[in-house]
Amino acid sequence: MEFVPCRKCNNGWLYKMTDDGMVAVECECHKKWDHENTVEKTYKHNGFDIRHYNYNPRTYAGTKSVKDKDRIINYVEQFDKNPAVRSLVCYLYGPNGTQKTTMMSWVGHQLLDKGYSVRYMLMNDLVKLLMDAEDFNQEKAEKAKAMVEKLEETDLIIIDEAFDKEKMKLYRSGYQLSYIDSWIRRRVGALNKGIFFVSNVEIKNIEANGLSHSIQDFVEREVVLHNCYLQFLDNYMQSTVKEFDGSLF
């Protein structure tokens, strides 16, 4: 992000004469640029797709899920006003192409801008990380454990492609399920920190997608308890293709 100074300063600095001589004071335009630059770098580092960085919910395409879109906007507004919101387990369901990931990337951007720590990751990557933390290879395990500890300190974790057997590598033995179950319960119960699941799988079908009844029961109970089940049902791709009558080649 290139810095463009305002008309008042000299490349981001204001020079004032004091009793001790000339003093350089950082201009507000440079402070703003520095903050935005830091947020953008953190956004990319924390797993978000930079293509969604400047997304604006006002450009949301569709009419079926406007109410839930507005609820997500309110979630962001309440995040720093109401501590209870920071510990919620939320679930955003919708078929492919319904702008779920794009909207949640906006959530990440807004909360990072407010000074909170937010991480975006796929559930398959989370499972792999939890398994690596128990690996016999000490170096590999220690590296994974350090990352797991960072996740514990993170204010909000957005988990995409959640509970989708087509997007997760689950062994027939199902031994990974205990890792997922324990991690979710610890984050919600012991750490009292929030999770925002994003999924193509309806919450009532988690078990049918190869996960355990225990996981579905816990997640469903936490989500329903606080009325945090949201749906995006407007297929952005279908509406775009329908409206687009030209060709680029």
Task: Identify the function of each model-found stretch.
Residues 9, 60, 104, 122, ...:
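Conserved RecA-like P-loop NTPase ATPase core
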Residues 1-74, 238-249:
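A short, basic N-terminal segment
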Residues 116-117, 153-157, 190-197:
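Loop/turn-to-beta-strand initiation segments
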